[in-house]
A protein has these predicted regions:
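Short, flexible loop segments at the rims of nucleotide/cofactor-binding pockets, characterized by
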Residues: 74-79, 102-103, 130-132
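Conserved short hydrophobic patches within well-ordered secondary structure
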Residues: 18, 22, 101, 111-112, ...
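N-terminal helical cap/lid subdomain that shapes the substrate entry/recognition surface
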Residues: 2-82, 86, 94
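Residue-level signal for short amphipathic helical patches enriched in basic/charged
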Residues: 44, 48, 103, 150
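Conserved phosphate-coupling serine/threonine residues in phosphotransfer and NTP-handling enzymes
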Residues: 13, 101-102
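Asp-based, Mg2+/Mn2+-dependent phosphohydrolase catalytic module
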Residues: 1-4, 37, 89-92, 105, ...
Length: 192
């Protein structure tokens, strides 16, 4: 194992949520009498939710609230990327620690419970903690100081994850798929 501590992003890294988030966004656009293609919305959401709202519904003050409500319905049945749970478990079995930082509120805790991966995290940081949003490194520096992290890897699917991790002095991995990540962190998953 190349690192002792792993700081994870949730959406798009452990949780395969961009499809459901995109569907909720397109549905919300339709509710507001607006249209955009699935692919356009998907690309915009990969930048950020705020960016997507500015692109497709900039003059609708209630849009974000309606989208978040639709997205919450979609996320009632969260789906992990294949191998995510096993990788988290193996890190723990090999003496490592997992941490999670998300921009979402305490809905994250429900998602972790539904996907049964909450037990793999030493600490989960959500919007409720009140830290500045990534790419600001404040939440990562909090974990670094509290847990005295020396050998840490930040894993996320967006440039803001990498920027925050680098600013906090961590190594970073821009997530593309679970198999490549397993090879990068040099963990042998136990096969049943």
């Amino acid at each position: 194992m190349n690192y002792q501590d792993y700081i994870w992003d949730l959406g798009g890294t452990l949780l395969d949520n961009y499809g459901t988030s995109t569907a909720a966004f397109v549905h919300t656009l339709q509710d507001f009498g607006l249209t955009a293609s699935h692919d356009e919305v998907y690309k915009a959401l990969k930048v950020s939710t705020e960016y997507a709202v500015r692109q497709f519904a900039p003059r609708n003050k209630e849009f974000l609230k309606a989208y978040k409500a639709n997205e919450a319905k979609e996320l009632e049945h969260p789906i992990l990327f294949d191998g995510a749970s096993e990788l988290l478990a193996q890190i723990i079995q090999q003496g490592g620690r997992n941490f999670l930082i998300s921009h979402r509120d305490d809905q994250v805790l429900e998602i972790l419970q539904k996907t049964q991966i909450g037990l793999y995290f030493t600490e989960v940081v959500t919007a409720t903690n009140g830290f500045k949003r990534k790419p600001d490194p404040e939440s990562m520096l909090y974990l670094k100081d509290k847990y005295q992290i020396q050998s840490g890897l930040v894993i996320g699917d967006r440039s803001i994850d990498v920027e925050a991790g680098q600013a906090a002095g961590f190594s970073c991995y821009l997530f593309d798929n679970m198999k490549n990540l397993e090879e990068f962190v040099d963990i042998e998953l136990e096969k049943e």
